[in-house]
């Protein structure tokens, strides 16, 4: 399909404006789920977050799977309606959140979304449920108003980003065909300004080292 025209985008934006209250209410539901992946007592909450997200992705018009891993599941949504010749965009995000402690430093409860000065305060609102949900709502707006998009889209949402993504690499290696794409859009990066769109092209990443040191069996004088 052809790229969207200015008139097409106007229709999409009108849909978004007319559904903002619903979008906000849905996001609040998402933020109320304490999907703390690092704590075993929140295993069921994290799974509930995955199921909730899968349902909303399906509502948006994607074909959705919840795929088990040795840890928390991956939610995978696909829309392939643009055809094999069209490029594919993969949107990455995560539905798990950091523990909220220390609780005494919160002005409002971490899992009860509160709006102050035009900002939503809750654990996960900016890392990463808010951004991830924004992309899903954008897809819903496009598919509802036009029934198609000029590109294929894959949405990959994991539930272990806050614990170092231990099962993401094996998942990717086992699903290379499903995840094949032309560009990856990561919904979990910084913004320089609300008024300055930007594209981050690299991140610091993580490096792990294991160091083994051997020495003398007893203390030696520094000159020996």
Predicted regions: what they are:
Residues 87-90, 119, 153-154, 182-184, ...:
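Structural motif
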Residues 1-8:
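Short, Lys/Arg-enriched N-terminal segments with co-localized hydrophobic residues
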Residues 9-11, 191-194, 201, 208-224:
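Metal-dependent amide/peptide-bond hydrolase catalytic core
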Residues 8-123, 142-149:
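Acidic/His- and Gly-rich active-site-bordering loop/insert found
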Residues 39, 98-99, 162-165, 192-194, ...:
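Flexible loop/turn segments at secondary-structure boundaries
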Residues 126-202:
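Acidic/histidine-rich catalytic neighborhood of metal-dependent amide-processing enzymes
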Residues 93-95, 117, 158-160, 187-190, ...:
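Fold-independent oxyanion-binding glycine-rich loops
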